[in-house]
Amino acid sequence: DKKNKFKLFHQVSTDEVFGDSERSNVPPDEKTAYSPSSPYSATKASSDHLVTSWGRTFKIPFTISICTNNYGPFQFPEKLIPIIILNSLKGKKIPVYGDGKQIRDWLHVEDHVNAILKIVFNKKYINQKFNISGNNQVKNIDLVKIICNQLNELVISKPKHLKDFKNLIDFVKDRPG
């Protein structure tokens, strides 16, 4: 019988474990059933289930945070918000998947970190999962237009051929899943 050396295991998950956000007008809560629709969301859902089962079986304290889309400093440049800004400044097309009507919630990375710290440093939250969101759902195309409008106001020297950054929007084939 080995003594449990874990003080707490924290799993960071994604709201994609609940499935496509377009299917429901009701935001998921912690009791919402998982319905992953892509290999990525299925692996995150599987990880959540493994953490829960290991925690219960081996008495390992755990917490799970299920988070919406993060944005902020040092984000990978291929993610939506950085790609809008970087491509705009270079005068390159801004790819928008499908019709752009996919709804996403956005959470600043510092808010996400603060939420995780509140969860992991409070013993009453052990063996629970929490949804974390910015509570600001927006369609991808609307977010792209908002950022383009801000860039139109802030950027003094646009690429020569460009009058409005929104002209760079390029609807591309939606990704599978």
Residue ranges: model-predicted function:
Residues S35, P77-E78:
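Active-site loop immediately N-terminal to the catalytic Tyr-X3-Lys motif
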Residues P82, S88-G177:
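C-terminal substrate-binding subdomain of Rossmann-fold SDR/epimerase-dehydratase oxidoreductases
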Residues P73-P77, N136:
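Residue-level signature of the cytosolic catalytic core of signaling kinases
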Residues P28, F76, W106:
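Aromatic/pi-system hotspot detector in well-structured domains
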Residues D1-N70, K90, E110, I119, ...:
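N-terminal Rossmann-like NAD(P)+-binding domain of SDR-like oxidoreductases, especially those catalyzing
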